[in-house]
Regions:
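Short secondary-structure transition hinges
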Residues: 76, 112-140
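Hydrophobic alpha-helical bundle segments that form small-molecule/ligand-binding pockets
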Residues: 136-162
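Hydrophobic alpha-helical connector segments
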Residues: 80-116
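Short amphipathic alpha-helical segment with a characteristic S/N-K-E followed by hydrophobic residues
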Residues: 64-69
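Amphipathic C-terminal alpha-helical segment
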Residues: 132-133, 163-183, 198-202
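Base-recognition residues in the alpha-helical recognition helix of bacterial helix-turn-helix
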Residues: 59-63
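C-terminal peripheral helix-coil segments that are non-catalytic and often amphipathic
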Residues: 1-6, 144, 179-202
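Basic, helix-initiating cap at the start of DNA-binding domains
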Residues: 1-37, 41-56
C-alpha cells in the first residue's frame, strides 16, 4: 500500500516518515499473508521475511502480531483535524468534519486495507479483544480532546458520556456492516453520527 500524500503530511522529519513507511509495508505484507494463509496460520517470522526485515526489527515496530492489524496511520490525522476545527462547531460537528476530511483523502487501496483490517478485528477472537483495548484508548483520547475543546474537565461525566456515545455509534456501524464492509463504511459512520447529533430519534 502506498502512503497517500495527505497521510504523510502530518509526519515531521525524515526519520519519522521512514518509520511510518516501514509500519505500512510490514502491515501490507501481513495482510497479504493473512489472505493467503489465514490469520492463525501466519507467523511473525513469515511476516518479517515477506517485509524483508528481521524478526527483531518487526518487534521494534509492533509488540505483537495483533498490533499489525490494529495499526492505523490515519489516527493522528483525525486528531489534528479535530483540534483544528473552528470553535463555532459543536464537538459532534467537529468530529464529523474531522473524520470525513481525513478519510476523503484515502486511496482506493487504503480504503480496501482498512475494510480488510476491520473484518479481521470482528472475526478473529484475539483481535476482537485487542479491538476493545484500542476502543478504550480511543475513548480516553476523545474524552481528553473534547474536554480541551469545550474547557471542561476530562473527569466530567457528561464529557465522558459524550465520548462513549461517539465510540458506540461507530462500533454499531462496524457490526452492522460486518458481512459487507465496503465503500459505504464512512458514509454509514457519518449517518450514525448525524443521528447521534439529532439525539438518536427513532
Amino acid at each position: 500500500m502506498k502512503l497517500s500524500t495527505k497521510n504523510i503530511q502530518h509526519i515531521e522529519g525524515l526519520r519519522e516518515r521512514k518509520k511510518a513507511k516501514t509500519h505500512v509495508e510490514v502491515q501490507k505484507q501481513a495482510l497479504r499473508l493473512f489472505r493467503e494463509k489465514g490469520y492463525g496460520n501466519t507467523t511473525v517470522e513469515q511476516i518479517a521475511d515477506a517485509a524483508e526485515v528481521s524478526p527483531s526489527t518487526f518487534f521494534r515496530y509492533f509488540s505483537t502480531k495483533e498490533d499489525v492489524v490494529m495499526y492505523n496511520i490515519i489516527d493522528p490525522v483525525v486528531i489534528e483535524a479535530f483540534k483544528a476545527q473552528p470553535v463555532g462547531l459543536s464537538p459532534i460537528q467537529a468530529i464529523r468534519v474531522s473524520i470525513k476530511s481525513s478519510y476523503d483523502g484515502f486511496t482506493a487501496e487504503e480504503s480496501a486495507d482498512l475494510q480488510e483490517r476491520t473484518k479481521l478485528m470482528l472475526k478473529v477472537p484475539e483481535l476482537r479483544a485487542k479491538m476493545l483495548d484500542k476502543l478504550t484508548q480511543n475513548l480516553e483520547v476523545l474524552t481528553k480532546l473534547t474536554a480541551e475543546r469545550i474547557g471542561r474537565s476530562a473527569d466530567d461525566l457528561a464529557v465522558r458520556t459524550f465520548a462513549g456515545a461517539v465510540i458506540g455509534v461507530i462500533i454499531s456501524v462496524f457490526f452492522h456492516d460486518d458481512e459487507n464492509l465496503n465503500a459505504n463504511l464512512f458514509k454509514h459512520i457519518d449517518v450514525a453520527l448525524t443521528q447521534l447529533e439529532a439525539g438518536l430519534p427513532l
